[in-house]
Swiss-Prot record:
Residues 19-149, 173-301 form the Galectin domain. GO terms for molecular function: carbohydrate binding. Transmembrane segments: none annotated. The keyword Repeat applies. InterPro entries: ConA-like_dom_sf, Galectin-like, Galectin_CRD. The gene is Lgals6. It comes from the Eukaryota. It comes from Mus musculus (Mouse). This is Galectin-6.
Length: 301
């Protein structure tokens, strides 16, 4: 079963370098960009460019450039009319050989940069964001995923993702699904299974009741349980999966889509399982709960 991302959400898994991709519809305030990668052991530099065009010599509205080669700092700058402006800099938040999560949020007055869940820098706009057409990434790093949020959706039968994602939410996480589930609605959950993890749970609850329409329960090193809790009783467990992405110390990108007669769940762009609806009043399924032995990178509901 092929994975079709929800409109407004554009993931790329294990992209190769150099990474150069157009931003559908161009850049605008409210967009977010999530980059998951690993700094190489011999890292000297890497960069992320919000570029005005696809060519290597194009102007750059925002140049984000970590440098380990004797500087151990991050340089921020803008290239306008072929000339670099005045550099801004801050001390290095990355470590050689270590995994990182990097988020860029396009705000009205600046780019907000978040590194590993902590606010890192705000870079004021020197060029109008509407001029930016491409995202470029290259250097001494390995990429696991790059995700665009809030991009201009292409024509599709799926409803667009509404509202911005919540980055690095605390646990237990409780989120309201405004309007409940509807057919083709998609929920995105990206997280990290702790190295010592035993279990965690993702629950879609029904109103203020105790009912759970869909219970997803990875039991690390054992199985992946799916079930429902209705009228005070658990239903029949389902455990069969082609593969289990929830290993200790593993990142995951989970997409949960509501179909006419079932939930369709994908992990890292690969179909994981289906779960037939046991609770039919989909709009009453209006709360998402997540808790257990994991950390959350973002939730988009």
């Amino acid at each position: 079963m092929a994975y079709v991302p929800a409109p407004g959400y554009q993931p790329t898994y294990n992209p190769t370098l150099p990474y150069k991709r157009p931003i559908p519809g161009g850049l605008s305030v409210g967009m977010s960009f999530y980059i998951q990668g690993t700094a190489k052991e011999n890292m000297r530099r890497f960069h992320v460019n919000f570029a005005v065009g696809q060519d290597d010599g194009a102007d750059v509205a925002f140049h984000f450039n970590p440098r380990f080669d004797g500087w151990d700092k991050v340089v921020f700058n803008t290239k306008q009319s072929g000339r670099w402006g005045k550099e801004e800099e801050k001390s290095m938040p990355f470590q050689k050989g270590k995994h990182f999560e990097l988020v860029f949020m396009v705000m009205p007055e600046h780019y907000k940069v978040v590194v590993n869940g902590s606010p890192f820098y705000e870079y004021g706009h020197r060029l109008p964001v509407q001029m930016v057409t491409h995202l470029q990434v290259d250097g001494d790093l390995e990429l696991q995923s790059i995700n665009f949020f809030g991009v201009q959706p292409a024509e599709t039968k799926y409803p667009a993702m509404t509202g911005p994602p919540v980055f690095n939410p605390c646990l237990p996480y409780v989120g309201a699904l405004q309007g409940g589930f509807t057919v083709r609605r998609t929920i995105i959950i990206k997280g990290y299974v702790l190295p010592t993890a035993k279990t965690f749970a993702i629950n879609f609850r029904v109103g203020s009741s105790e009912d759970i329409a869909l219970h997803i329960n990875p039991r690390i090193g054992d199985c992946l349980v799916r079930n429902s809790y209705m009228n005070g009783s658990w239903g029949t467990e389902e455990r069969m999966v082609a593969y289990n992405p929830f290993g200790p110390g593993q990142f995951f990108d989970l997409s949960i889509r509501c179909g006419m007669d079932r939930f369709k769940v994908f992990a890292n762009g690969i179909h994981l399982f289906n779960f037939s609806h046991r609770f039919q009043a989909l709009r009453k399924i209006n709360t998402l709960e997540i808790n257990g032995d994991l950390t959350l990178s973002y939730v988009h509901i």
